[in-house]
A protein has these predicted regions:
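Solvent-exposed, non-transmembrane regions of membrane-associated and secreted proteins
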Residues: 4-256, 285
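Alpha-helical transmembrane segments
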Residues: 21, 270-286
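N-terminal membrane-entry
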Residues: 258-268
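Cytoplasmic C-terminal tails of single-pass
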Residues: 286-292
């Protein structure tokens, strides 16, 4: 076998390996993303558990004052007396890198919540929309949490459209767990933000993602209203870090099963085509040897 033939065969083998890599990328990258999310959740829990009561209470009070200022600003806006308080919870509350984390049992979501909605934030978790209430709940508050949908490397809010009225999601903020029950699902244009404002007397949290899937011309708003939290209903036991890690493992397995038809079709086409190329090269080599 001459050098040229060896190079062609080597190239064909490399292409086959590349095809396998392309086909397996979504699953592997999602496993890595899930692992990072699990680590962030564990770090947050450890940070909160290490905080003394005085510091924790001070952080909660700062968050509530911030939310009250947002409510007061809403009243001034309604009266035509808008004023910028210049206050940011970032300057007042320090509980680590993330603000907390969200769990959505129905769609196996367990993600850290970060300040802001930059691309860097939304690639690793859920972002808290600036100008919305700090996600600690309370009367006349409305926190808005945003997440990407349809990324190849992470699931994030991809399955948010499966939530229906009556489903629940949970916010783990400091040492509290806030339960929200979905009471409204809407699709709006990006500039339509009326459904994200504070409603006097209500305690809302709205989850936002792009829709339709992979087109992203509109926004899906899944709003939850605060309901009493029963410590058993979220995971069937007291929430612990080890349980979240188990949930992450279950999520990855579920994703592999759900995505397997697409993975197998894509992988089969790529690998099959490259295997055919390899066979053609081998046939050509054999024919050349016979001719010689």
């Amino acid at each position: 076998m001459d050098t040229s033939t060896r190079l062609k065969l080597g190239f064909a083998a490399l292409m086959i390996l590349s095809g396998i890599g392309v086909a397996s990328y979504p699953v592997i990258s999602n496993m890595v993303a899930q692992r990072h999310a699990s680590t962030a959740i564990q770090n947050y829990d450890e940070t909160v558990q290490s905080m003394d009561t005085e510091k924790l209470d001070a952080a909660k009070e700062a968050a509530r004052r911030y939310n009250q200022q947002l409510g007061n600003a809403l009243d001034r806006d309604a009266a035509g007396e808008a004023e910028d308080t210049g206050t940011s919870y970032v300057d007042l509350i320090d509980v680590g890198e993330s603000l907390g984390y969200i769990t959505i049992p129905k769609i196996d979501v367990n993600l850290p919540i970060y300040e802001g909605t930059s691309d860097d934030v939304l690639l690793k978790g859920v972002g808290h929309l600036e100008g919305s209430s700090y996600p600690l709940g309370g009367e006349s508050t409305h926190s808005v949490l945003t997440g990407h949908r349809g990324l190849a490397e992470a699931v994030l809010f991809t399955d948010l459209d499966k939530l229906q009225e009556g489903d629940k999601f949970y916010l783990h903020i400091m040492d509290e767990v806030l339960a929200y029950q979905v009471d409204q699902v809407k699709v709006v244009l990006p500039e339509e933000t009326d459904d994200l404002t504070i409603v006097q007397g209500q305690d809302y949290c709205t989850l936002v993602t792009c829709t339709p899937y992979a087109i992203n011309t509109h926004r899906m708003l899944v709003r939850g209203t605060r309901v009493p939290y029963n410590g058993e209903e979220e995971t069937g036991d007291t929430p612990q870090v080890v349980q979240y890690q188990a949930l992450h493992t279950g999520t990855v397995i579920k994703r592999i099963v759900d995505a397997w038809p697409w993975i197998s079709v894509t992988g089969s086409v790529i690998i099959g085509g490259e295997a055919l190329l390899l066979l053609l090269l081998l046939h050509r080599c054999k024919k050349r040897e016979e001719d010689d």
